[in-house]
Amino acid sequence: RSRSRSRRSSRSRSRSISKSRSRSRSRSKGRSRSRSKGRKSRSKSKSKPKSDRGSRSRSRSRSKDEYEKSRSRSRSRSRSP
C-alpha cells in the first residue's frame, strides 16, 4: 500500500513540474509579445489618423448598405403574406 502511494505522489509531482514549465514558457511569450506590440503601436500611431478616417467612412457605408438590405428584406416579407 505504501509503495503505491509513493508512486502516485511522484507522478503528481512530475505533472506539477511540467505545468510550471508550460506556465513559465507562456509568461515569456506574453512578455515578448507585449514588448513588440508596444514598439509597433508607437510607430503606427503617427500614421494612424488618415487611415482611421478612411476605415470609419468605409464602416459607415457598409452599415448603410446592410440597413437598406434588411429594410428590403422586411418589405418582401410583408408583401408575401
Curated annotation (Swiss-Prot):
Residue ranges with Basic and acidic residues bias: 62-71
Gene Ontology, cellular component aspect: nuclear speck
Keyword Cytoplasm: no
UniProt keyword annotation of DNA damage present: no
Annotated keywords: mRNA processing, mRNA splicing, Nucleus, Phosphoprotein, Repeat, Repressor, RNA-binding
GO terms, biological process: alternative mRNA splicing, via spliceosome; mRNA splice site recognition; negative regulation of keratinocyte differentiation; negative regulation of mRNA splicing, via spliceosome; regulation of alternative mRNA splicing, via spliceosome; regulation of keratinocyte proliferation; regulation of wound healing
Record-given protein name: Serine/arginine-rich splicing factor 6
Provenance organism: Oryctolagus cuniculus
Source taxonomy: Eukaryota, Metazoa, Chordata, Craniata, Vertebrata
